[in-house]
């Protein structure tokens, strides 16, 4: 059976796609053909092939199996706002069953599937349903990406607690430098997170402009995921 994980973040723009790309590259290099899945994406640009989201394109490029764009990203919206708002505006409700169907198809084609969320843990997909609800339904282990900046300690601890209160496994976390050069208190933030979060830090990464091209996987040890 294919292994699956859900990659969430402490906020939007904290480096989920960088971390997901690194995980995919490392898994493929270790001999586990892997697929990236971005079920819902907002903030996309019109191309000759239709709407395309940069995060989803990075997952497609770093997958170890050949995937069409629609397989990676079934729901794509142009406006960079919460999915439940833009989907209601466009009259395109997000169907949780369709998200699950897409996941099943990828499980049949890859040894590992990395599912990247949108925004943070409780991002709404509708007025009544959040991404967290879908992850709980699918019983996906969670990988938390922490954007290292002022406020990240509170955000990370709250997210980790929410994951565990949902009865899900927090597999580990990845620290991502989001502000360019590390700040003066960077190492102290990391030390506090290592002490307060219930799982180990797998890696430190840095936000980059083109995660679909950057050699990110070499910095990540995926031995724990392979167990």
UniProtKB/Swiss-Prot annotation:
Protein name as annotated: ATP-dependent dethiobiotin synthetase BioD
Known cofactor(s): Mg(2+)
Catalytic EC class: ligase
Record flagged with keyword Repeat: no
Molecular function terms, GO-annotated: ATP binding; dethiobiotin synthase activity; magnesium ion binding
Annotated localization: Cytoplasm
Gene transcribed to yield this protein: bioD
Keyword list, A-Z: ATP-binding, Biotin biosynthesis, Cytoplasm, Ligase, Magnesium, Metal-binding, Nucleotide-binding
Reaction catalyzed: (7R,8S)-7,8-diammoniononanoate + CO2 + ATP = (4R,5S)-dethiobiotin + ADP + phosphate + 3 H(+)
Active site: 38
NCBIfam families assigned: bioD
Origin species: Serratia marcescens
HAMAP family to which the protein is assigned, alphabetical: BioD
Pathway assigned in UniProt: Cofactor biosynthesis; biotin biosynthesis; biotin from 7,8-diaminononanoate: step 1/2
Signal peptide: none
Residues binding ATP: 13-18, 55, 116-119, 176-177
Positions with a binding annotation for substrate: 42
Catalytic activity, EC: 6.3.3.3
Parts forming coiled coils: none
Family per record: Belongs to the dethiobiotin synthetase family.
Cellular component annotations (GO), alphabetically ordered: cytosol
Positions contributing to Mg(2+) binding: 17, 55, 116
